[in-house]
Amino acid sequence: MAVNPLDFLKNMSSVKNNIDNIKKEISKITVCGKAGSNIVAIEMDGEFNVKKVSINKEFFDDLDNDAFEQMIKSALNDAVSKVKEEIKLKTMGVLPFGM
């Protein structure tokens, strides 16, 4: 069965439009990763840029350095996981298999 090059190009144009729309949607994503019962919260966008770091100062003085560093790491990893999940949800069924 021969493939019509014009049909292929039309499909590629559609794929490009889908990718452009997905990029716009991803740029709108904002998530908040949290750790230590909200002692540390990190806001991140869909491009994995940290937009805000919040620290509940009420608990800050009671933490040692290692515990505080671990909470920051956990909150950051939580935010990254949430961005990845949002991207997965927004791209599911939109891109052709394997992209």
Curated annotation (Swiss-Prot):
<dbReference type="InterPro" id="IPR036894">
    <property type="entry name" value="YbaB-like_sf"/>
</dbReference>
<keyword id="KW-0963">Cytoplasm</keyword>
<comment type="subunit">
    <text>Homodimer.</text>
</comment>
<comment type="similarity">
    <text>Belongs to the YbaB/EbfC family.</text>
</comment>
<dbReference type="InterPro" id="IPR004401">
    <property type="entry name" value="YbaB/EbfC"/>
</dbReference>
<dbReference type="GO" id="GO:0043590">
    <property type="term" value="C:bacterial nucleoid"/>
</dbReference>
<keyword id="KW-0238">DNA-binding</keyword>
<comment type="function">
    <text>Binds to DNA and alters its conformation. May be involved in regulation of gene expression, nucleoid organization and DNA protection.</text>
</comment>
<protein>
    <recommendedName>
        <fullName>Nucleoid-associated protein EbfC</fullName>
    </recommendedName>
</protein>
<dbReference type="GO" id="GO:0005737">
    <property type="term" value="C:cytoplasm"/>
</dbReference>
<dbReference type="GO" id="GO:0003677">
    <property type="term" value="F:DNA binding"/>
</dbReference>
<dbReference type="Pfam" id="PF02575">
    <property type="entry name" value="YbaB_DNA_bd"/>
</dbReference>
